[in-house]
Amino acid sequence: MLVIPAIDLKDGRCVRLRQGDMAAETVYSDDVPAVARQWQQGGATLIHVVDLNGAVDGEPRNFPQIEAIIRTVTVKVQVGGGIRSIETVRRYLGAGVTRLVLGTSALADRSFLEKACLEFPRQILLGLDARDGKVAVKGWTALSETKATDLLKELAGYALGAVIYTDIARDGMLGGPNLAALREVVELSSFPVIASGGISQVEDLRAVQSLGPRVEGAIVGKALYDGKLDYRAALAALGAE
């Protein structure tokens, strides 16, 4: 199972938010490429990057920083946040991004999701962000009436690469993942699942890994930046190193 470090970008800097609240940020670094380099040197094979401004505004806002990450590291980079058009998809993949995460657009514009999956099969991931079982959209600033489980069923035939499941209530809180919800997603999903939100210790990673081989990885952010979780130790514990 992959342990995937997260780089969340806001106003050109690496930050972390509490439960997706744009006003509750902690700035970790102004040197975004250096952060990416640090994770590559630590053993990461995939880095998860989120354009937080883009997620709210609906279009890329930190593209220069993401380009700088691509130029700096040789490992795979997946990007989410503000990807609402096929032109944006082509722009990112053309710049060297490996995979893209679609969230709001998967719910709001199914024809766009279809087109992206047809043009770039398995390079499009579903960002399934949920609070109390309902899908959140627009950078988590709005809650839809759609159940996360229903959306999974609807998208079963799409050429998605994976599903990233985030429990918003757990994100940035270091309280452990929502294993019950995650288990339901793993059982329902036709695609590999990546867990996100709340992971703070090796035991959390082992619990996620125990959900079976369909769990591709776990995204970790705050715990790494706050020093609560040592990245190399996490890799070693999961036998990933």
Residue positions per predicted region:
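Structural preference for beta-strand elements that scaffold enzyme active sites
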Residues: 2-6, 46, 74-78, 98-101, ...
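Conserved, mostly hydrophobic/aromatic
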Residues: 8, 39, 47, 79, ...
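Conserved anion-binding
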Residues: 12-15, 19-24, 90-93, 97-171
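Glycine-rich, proline-tolerant flexible connector loops at the mouths of alpha/beta enzymes
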Residues: 46-64, 104, 165-175
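Glycine/small-residue-rich loop that forms an oxyanion/phosphate-binding "nest" at active or ligand-binding sites
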Residues: 53, 58-118
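Charged helix-capping and loop-helix junction motifs
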Residues: 60-67, 110, 141-150, 175-184
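Catalytic cores of alpha/beta
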Residues: 70-99, 180-215, 234
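C-terminal helical cap(s) of enzyme catalytic domains, especially alpha/beta-barrels
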Residues: 111-119, 124, 209-220, 224-241
